[in-house]
Amino acid sequence: MKIRKLFALVLALTAITAVAFAEFDTSKTIAVVSREEGSGTRGAFIELTGIATKDADGKEVDNTYIEADFVNGTSLVITTVSQNDAAIGYASLSSVLHNDTVKMVKIDGVEASTENILNNTYPIARPFNIVTNGELTNELAKDFMAFIMSKEGQAVVAEDGLVPVANDETPSYTASGLKGVVVVGGSTSVAPVMEKLGEAYAALNPEVEVDVQATGSSAGVAGALDGTYMIGMASRALKSSETDGGAVGTVIGLDGIAVIVNPANSIEDLSVEQVKKIFTGEVTVWADANK
């Protein structure tokens, strides 16, 4: 009786192992997951991968696959990919660096990491910007910006997985003792590190609250210009139309854009060109992804 039970247990474990290590079905249709229009991550991604082109008038054309699943926000991209073994998406490196619900794909043989962004070998990287409508006049907002760009603020940026812009001449921060609320709004990718910066700043200035609103990069720039936000957030370089309108960007750190798939997917490496073909709909089946 015991032998039969043991044999049954061995068979069950063998079956489980076989399922766990079953080869991914590459005949599956690729489920492309993209960010919504106005997303700074999307804007940077389509530019860096060649998905965006120029028309005859020199205007940018976004050639993202029309059948893609367009979702709002970084967390929803991650959730969508984690729940579909045929899905592929992209997200801020800092948001997936320690997330095992999705798998980061190498790009041109290079892993997405802060080290590879710093040494310029990872090809899909972009700046994180804070945005104002010119020179700040609000003392509290100015002080918070000073903290972000200080040694202490840049340490928070580094701890969040970004490449900081600090150097040997970066000043230390001295608590100001100011009171009030700083309203910051924009990129959903920048928002997590901004929340941590706000917490660190408030710890030094207990009577200050930093209100971070994640609304998207374009909304962040527009909000900084029209006064909705004291400080905007953009997870991309500012457009000429935005700077012409008075927007001023300050880079607080560099972030990679990780291409992510479901952990069940056997794909490990894609070239930038292959990524482009997938996200424009030229390649629609996983079996053709590495061709």
Regions found by a protein language model. Give the residues of each.
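Sec-dependent N-terminal signal peptides of Gram-positive bacterial secreted proteins and lipoproteins
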Residues: 2-22
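Exported/periplasmic ABC-transporter solute-binding proteins
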Residues: 21-291
